[in-house]
From Swiss-Prot:
Native species: Yersinia pseudotuberculosis serotype O:1b (strain IP 31758)
Role description: Specifically methylates the cytosine at position 1962 (m5C1962) of 23S rRNA.
Family matches, as PANTHER family: RIBOSOMAL RNA LARGE SUBUNIT METHYLTRANSFERASE (PTHR42873), S-ADENOSYLMETHIONINE-DEPENDENT METHYLTRANSFERASE DOMAIN-CONTAINING PROTEIN (PTHR42873:SF1)
Family: Belongs to the methyltransferase superfamily. RlmI family.
Record's protein name: Ribosomal RNA large subunit methyltransferase I
PROSITE patterns, alphabetized: PUA
Length: 396
């Protein structure tokens, strides 16, 4: 008999709106014993069936919904259906944008909570971020092998969020061939190397694809500063947009080395590039003291907010770094500024940029707004899925 989780009276409203999370505070009782990650049924206080979900006893999110259809079984066929639904959309995007690298599964927004899958050529990179996802590992891999027999599958579930679920960090080959040290993918006419084994996340920031295209369109004739450059995809975009010069800054020499290889891979002019290993905050202050000026600054920092208690300090960090960037821009210059922190609301981020401009002594115009690329969809019932936000700001 399936274990049943009974909600407290009046706590079913979010599920009726098809939100996929059940928090521990919404629960009246659990009927039966469930293993971590096991599939359970969710009922309201009157015993009415609401959803089928994965149980996460170590997490504040006590259950994550697999399905709102009572007759749907969570088996290999279920995962195959979800994969096929997701692939239909990615096929269209891949053809439109010339892609052989994209996010295949974006967790809750593709009906597979706690599961991220990126495809790079014929390599599938898997992240299992919840107890339910881990519990279904073998079934999911079987579904992937059924749908993608040509693909190797590599595990990058080496992310700290698994600790909140009581799960160990895992990484390694699941099946097929080991990925090469650097694998090239195509994006809007660019070739970009992906480091599947050692790179950030699954190896590459696919979510910034549209923003890179925007940077390319803004770059013509401009002197560009690419902050938190990682492997230099924004630098490639700027060079393809005929920038005057692009300086890429990161604290890691290894990613800067890959950035240089990306420039060479696209047969672009290395003499127009500079790679600086430094702390961005310190370097911006040094540039300000030296009187350096730029026409386009790309500010794409790592996540500043891991939990709500860090939001206030993150706001200060975003404000400080964007103030410095605005001070380095010539009149008419463009700042492309981003936040990948899901806990940072877009309206608050916009206010931070406005305050940064005020402190910098400049007026700015918001001329364009960005979000994650379309292979990272946001299902209507789950607004938390919108984590990446950005603005193009013109300095007056």
């Amino acid at each position: 008999m399936t274990v049943r989780l009974i909600l407290a009276k009046g706590r079913e409203k979010s599920l009726l709106r098809r939100h996929p999370w059940i928090f521990s505070g919404a629960v009246q009782r659990l009927e039966g014993d469930a293993l971590s990650g096991e599939t359970i049924d969710i009922l309201d206080s009157q015993g009415k069936w609401l959803a089928r979900a994965a149980y996460s006893p170590e997490s504040q999110i006590l259950a994550r919904v697999w399905t709102f259809q009572q007759d749907e079984v969570i088996d290999c066929a279920f995962f195959i259906r979800r994969l096929q639904q997701a692939q239909n959309w990615r096929d269209w995007l891949a053809q439109r944008d010339g892609l052989n690298g994209y996010r295949l599964i974006a967790g809750e927004s593709d009906g597979l909570p706690g599961i991220t899958i990126d495809r790079f050529q014929n390599f599938l990179v898997l992240q299992l971020l919840s107890a339910g996802a881990e519990y279904q590992r073998e079934t999911l891999v079987s579904a992937l092998q059924h749908c993608y027999p040509e693909c190797s599958i590599y595990d990058r579930s080496d992310v700290s969020v698994r600790k909140k679920e009581g799960l160990p960090l895992t990484q390694g080959l699941i099946c097929g061939e080991m990925p090469p040290a650097l694998l090239p993918i195509s994006e809007n006419g660019m070739q970009l190397f992906v480091d599947i084994q050692q790179g950030h996340k699954t190896g590459f920031y696919l979510d910034q694809r549209d923003s890179r295209l925007a940077a390319r369109n803004y770059a013509n004739g401009r002197r560009v500063l690419n902050c938190f450059s990682y492997t230099g995809a924004f630098a490639v975009a700027a060079l393809m947009g005929n920038c005057q010069q692009v300086i890429s800054v990161d604290t890691s020499q290894s990613v800067l080395d890959i950035a240089k290889q990306n420039i060479e891979l696209n047969q672009l002019d290395l003499s127009k590039t500079e790679f600086v290993r430094d702390d961005v905050f310190q370097l911006l202050r040094s540039y300000r003291a030296q009187g350096e000026k730029f026409d386009l600054i790309i500010m794409d920092p790592p996540k500043f907010v891991e939990n709500k208690s860090q939001l206030a300090s993150a706001c200060r960090g975003y404000k400080d770094i964007n103030m410095l960037a605005i001070q380095l821009l010539r009149p008419g210059g463009i700042l492309l500024s981003f936040s990948c922190s899901g806990l940072m609301p877009v309206d608050l981020f916009q206010k931070i940029l406005a305050d940064a401009a005020l402190d910098a002594g400049h007026d700015i115009q918001f001329i364009e707004q960005f979000r994650q690329a379309a292979d990272h969809p946001v299902i209507a019932a789950y607004p938390e899925g919108l984590y990446l936000k950005g603005f193009a700001c013109r300095i007056m």
